[in-house]
Swiss-Prot record:
Its EC number is 6.3.5.-. The keyword Nucleotide-binding applies. Disulfide bonds: none annotated. Allows the formation of correctly charged Asn-tRNA(Asn) or Gln-tRNA(Gln) through the transamidation of misacylated Asp-tRNA(Asn) or Glu-tRNA(Gln) in organisms which lack either or both of asparaginyl-tRNA or glutaminyl-tRNA synthetases. The reaction takes place in the presence of glutamine and ATP through an activated phospho-Asp-tRNA(Asn) or phospho-Glu-tRNA(Gln). It is an enzyme of class 6 (ligase). GO terms for biological process: glutaminyl-tRNAGln biosynthesis via transamidation; regulation of translational fidelity; translation. This is Aspartyl/glutamyl-tRNA(Asn/Gln) amidotransferase subunit C.
């Protein structure tokens, strides 16, 4: 399937995209390329392939629900512009 300039203008108008006439041919080429990829996907034989509806069958690793400090406090505070002890120091924003 190949799009002509009139169809590209119509698609742009429906999508409320303003395009210049100078950009029309570039956009036409991009859209034709996308449609070409879709045509390639339509040629794939998917007989006997069950659709994937989610990852519900995947087993998740479980860990204990324990509160930690992340074991990286010093590394995190090293990125702070100013720190006071184990805390970030920020300018006062409320008077």
């Amino acid at each position: 399937m190949s799009l002509d300039p009139a169809t590209v203008r119509r698609i742009a108008r429906l999508a409320r995209i303003g395009i210049d006439e100078s950009d029309l041919h570039a956009l036409q080429g991009e859209l034709n390329g996308i449609l070409g990829w879709i045509e390639q996907l339509n040629e794939v034989d998917i007989d006997g392939v069950e659709p994937m509806v989610g990852t519900g069958h995947a087993a998740l690793r479980m860990r204990e629900d324990v509160v930690t400090d992340g074991a990286a406090r010093d590394a995190v505070l090293s990125n702070a512009p100013d720190a006071a002890g184990p805390f970030y120091t920020v300018p006062k924003v409320v008077e």
